[in-house]
Amino acid sequence: IPRVTPSTLTALAEEKTLQTSFIRDEDERPKVAYNQFSNEIPIISLEGIDDETGKRAEICDKIVKACEDWGVFQVVDHGVDAEVISQMTTFAKEFFALPPEEKLRFDMSGGKKGGFIVSSHLQGEVVQDWREIVTYFSYPTRARDYSRWPDKPEGWIAVTQKYSEKLMELACKLLDVLSEAMGLEKEALTKACVDMDQKVVVNFYPKCPEPDLTLGLKRHTDPGTITLLLQDQVGGLQATKDNGKTWITVQPVEGAFVVNLGDHGHFLSNGRFKNADHQAVVNSNSSRLSIATFQNPAPEAIVYPLKIREGEKSIMDEPITFAEMYRRKMSKDLELARLKKQAKEQQLQAEVAAEKAKLESKPIEEILA
């Protein structure tokens, strides 16, 4: 099948087979089902986190343990209004159900800041992810370009503003906890971001004809400081803490946020807090919606451990800007993809040569028989 980037993925969801541009190498394919849920990821109630009593200390201990263990946990009783969450998800579902031409009015290909895109993948990578997304660059607020925010369904812009504000508050609250755990002033991690940047990414994973051959979102760690993910009840978020040998599917919890740390948070803590290694799988039964809110440092923010514990060395050779850290991460990912492609081509050439040699060593009578 020729490689075709569809106008939208929703059209491909009805096909019987998957287009080759979405088929991943065997070692990258899902190993665990989208609905084979694990309870290994802790669910932490934030009720009482603002009381400067024993309750706060208890919650902080749980968060710190989760960050040291997995780099990912879920929070409930987080103070984000259920009505805002409900409106945000309802509007998002309505947007993805719009006809392709309505969604493509906000097409963000070609480097536009925000909008709609089909099957994002890194430039230079061959395999595409099975998802459609809407991206909002929401902080700093002065940099917002509302012409890139979908105006349908009506009312979504106002709800997204409110949602992004509430999630920024929650993210800062969680970073305060981690700063204290590192023995630093409360605002240390937030200050290290200089002028915190926020990106809201709404992911829509349509049902997929051959989900065992592809991923909704390839395996990765987030580059930024902290990510908050709202997911529906379908399931598909997976995490690994042994470099991909074993995977678990995170149990969806109604109204909860899945919190994970990114590379920036990992470096600031000198590796004490894990940057969660994760991916999204898809299924053939139903579509899935998730909303990821990324809090990142400003491009010029300096990345270096804020505290190095006694007897430890820095996990970084030198302080670098976040922009440079991100550039190096992208270059490394592209180089790995290139090497993998090269190895595949060499293996194919070796197999062809072996077949040819086998054929040449046979008597002509045997070949013609």
UniProtKB/Swiss-Prot annotation:
EC category name: oxidoreductase
Cofactors named for this entry: Fe(2+); L-ascorbate
Entry binding sites for Fe cation: H220, D222, H278
Source species, domain of life: Eukaryota
GO molecular function terms attached to this record: flavanone 3-dioxygenase activity; L-ascorbic acid binding; metal ion binding
Chain residues that bind 2-oxoglutarate: R288
GO terms classed as biological process: coumarin biosynthetic process; flavonoid biosynthetic process; response to molecule of fungal origin
Cofactor binding annotation: Binds 1 Fe(2+) ion per subunit.
Keywords: Dioxygenase, Flavonoid biosynthesis, Iron, Metal-binding, Oxidoreductase, Vitamin C
Catalytic activity: a (2S)-flavan-4-one + 2-oxoglutarate + O2 = a (2R,3R)-dihydroflavonol + succinate + CO2
Function: Catalyzes the 3-beta-hydroxylation of 2S-flavanones to 2R,3R-dihydroflavonols which are intermediates in the biosynthesis of flavonols, anthocyanidins, catechins and proanthocyanidins in plants.
Family: Belongs to the iron/ascorbate-dependent oxidoreductase family.
Protein name (record): Naringenin,2-oxoglutarate 3-dioxygenase
Species whose genome carries this gene: Petunia hybrida
Gene name of the encoded protein: AN3
